[in-house]
């Protein structure tokens, strides 16, 4: 008897909690529900695609800057990490862009980057840096290392230094002396004429002192 009583009690509780079926909508319309489901799924897929696109874009823009060692590939800074399947328009654009890049590579470079850093400009056709292998000069072992010494009998002898020019000075001939005397006389006449013309001009002779009174 106790079991039948408890079963009746559970049934009465279930009946009291379940809402009454309204009389207006007897059965739900299957076409209306499927339309709502389709609209909701479409909205969700559009928002998910938008979100994915935004995530992709931010991922491309916020990639970390490379270290100094990898600055050679700066063109890949804003490119995606994974290669997406390219359509024919992308391939055409890549070909168009590559044609310009190849043209730029074919043009001769004005100078090397080392020249831009050092300020050195090299003529066209010459290397910007001298190859040390081509600059090896054969040193003559017999010549002394220092210009202050002369090799005399296999021994180094200190050279006498003088400021005189070692070129051979020839003594002037009588004709050259006469020409020089003629030039000196003309020079003296010109000086005298200038002195007469300007007045207080005085040309100091040799061993003559100016005495102010």
Curated annotation (Swiss-Prot):
GO terms for biological process: cell-cell junction assembly; cellularization; cleavage furrow formation; morphogenesis of embryonic epithelium; regulation of cell shape. The keyword Repressor does not apply. Keywords: Developmental protein. The keyword Phosphoprotein does not apply. One of its GO terms (cellular component) is cell-cell junction. It comes from the Eukaryota. Blastoderm. Throughout the entire cortex of the embryo although the distribution is not uniform. Actin-myosin network stability during cellularization. Might be involved in increasing actin-actin interactions or membrane-to-cytoskeleton attachments. nullo together with Sry-a and bnk may provide auxiliary functions, by acting both to stabilize a large and dynamic microfilament structure and regulate its functions. This is Protein nullo.
């Amino acid at each position: 008897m106790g079991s039948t009583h408890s079963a009746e009690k559970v049934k009465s509780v279930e009946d009291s909690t379940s809402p009454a079926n309204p009389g207006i909508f007897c059965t739900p319309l299957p076409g209306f529900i499927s339309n709502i489901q389709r609209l909701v799924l479409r909205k969700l897929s559009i928002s998910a695609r938008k979100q994915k696109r935004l995530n992709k874009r931010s991922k491309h823009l916020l990639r970390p800057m490379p270290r100094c060692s990898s600055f050679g590939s700066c063109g890949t800074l804003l490119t995606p990490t994974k290669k997406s399947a390219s359509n024919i328009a992308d391939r055409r654009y890549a070909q168009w862009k590559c044609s310009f890049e190849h043209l730029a590579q074919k043009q001769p470079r004005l100078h090397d980057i080392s020249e831009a850093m050092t300020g050195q400009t090299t003529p066209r056709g010459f290397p910007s840096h001298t190859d040390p292998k081509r600059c090896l000069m054969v040193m003559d072992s017999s010549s002394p290392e220092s210009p202050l010494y002369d090799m005399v009998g296999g021994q180094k002898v200190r050279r006498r230094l003088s400021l005189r020019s070692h070129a051979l000075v020839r003594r002037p001939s009588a004709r050259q002396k006469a020409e020089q005397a003629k030039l000196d006389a003309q020079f003296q006449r010109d000086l005298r004429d200038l002195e007469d013309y300007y007045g207080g001009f005085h040309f100091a002779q040799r061993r003559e002192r100016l005495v102010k009174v």
